[in-house]
């Protein structure tokens, strides 16, 4: 198994950016892979490009427009607004069916072609917003499936799986990239960089985590 190279599934948001710099500390060579699925806010791809260019990280953008055709929701359609709060039942309307399944599957194909075993993704079960494809059981099962499907030893790593948003901010702080994550990323479901709109579930979770981080760790 190649212990010197890794691929990061990279959206340009808080979690994947934190994972990107975590990977840079751990591996000699890191490749960031982003996906263009004709998402509503293309600014996230621009953020991903800018971060990789600025910090000299190899970046690959894969075309996955088919996902947009199959999964209409508030992140892929201009006429569907993002719910301001999580529904009492079911998944939020920002959930893109199959997204992490397809992202990780295509990244695995790319990784095998490059002789890379480690795949890093920023999913978290602690703050998973009701998304079923952010759960540890899904990641573990997909890891086994990909290994069997391609007769290859992939290792899907999830540095944020069991930590909350405050602890994710703390990780960025410990890595020395707090300002990068705070100012250069896009987490907002309404496509606003840095602190975002302040109203969507992603912004609320990000802000709540930062305030908890400040209170707990920046005394």
UniProtKB/Swiss-Prot annotation:
Pathway: Purine metabolism; 7-cyano-7-deazaguanine biosynthesis. One of its GO terms (molecular function) is ATP binding. Its cofactor is Zn(2+). Coiled coil: none annotated. It comes from the Bacteria. One of its GO terms (biological process) is queuosine biosynthetic process. SUPFAM superfamilies: Adenine nucleotide alpha hydrolases-like. Catalyzes the ATP-dependent conversion of 7-carboxy-7-deazaguanine (CDG) to 7-cyano-7-deazaguanine (preQ(0)). Belongs to the QueC family. This is 7-cyano-7-deazaguanine synthase. It comes from Clostridium botulinum (strain 657 / Type Ba4). The gene is queC.
């Amino acid at each position: 198994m190649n212990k010197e190279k890794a691929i990061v599934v990279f959206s340009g948001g808080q979690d994947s950016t934190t994972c990107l710099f975590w990977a840079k500390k751990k591996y000699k060579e890191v490749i960031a892979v982003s996906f263009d699925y004709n998402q509503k806010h293309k600014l996230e791809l621009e953020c991903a490009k800018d971060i990789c260019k600025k910090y000299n990280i190899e970046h690959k953008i894969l075309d996955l427009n088919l996902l947009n055709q199959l999964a209409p929701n508030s992140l892929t359609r201009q006429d569907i607004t993002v719910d301001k709060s999580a529904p009492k039942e079911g998944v939020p309307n920002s959930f893109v069916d199959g997204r992490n399944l397809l992202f990780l599957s295509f990244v695995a194909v790319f990784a095998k072609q490059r002789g890379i075993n480690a795949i890093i993704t920023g999913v978290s079960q602690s703050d998973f917003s009701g998304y079923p494809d952010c759960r540890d059981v899904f990641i573990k099962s997909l890891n086994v499936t990909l290994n069997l499907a391609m007769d290859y030893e992939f290792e899907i790593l999830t540095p944020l799986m069991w930590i909350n948003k405050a602890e994710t901010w703390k990780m960025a702080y410990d890595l020395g990239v707090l300002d990068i994550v705070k100012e250069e990323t896009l987490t907002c479901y309404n496509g606003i960089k840095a602190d975002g709109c302040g109203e969507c579930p992603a912004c609320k979770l990000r802000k709540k985590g930062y305030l908890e981080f400040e209170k707990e760790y920046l005394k």
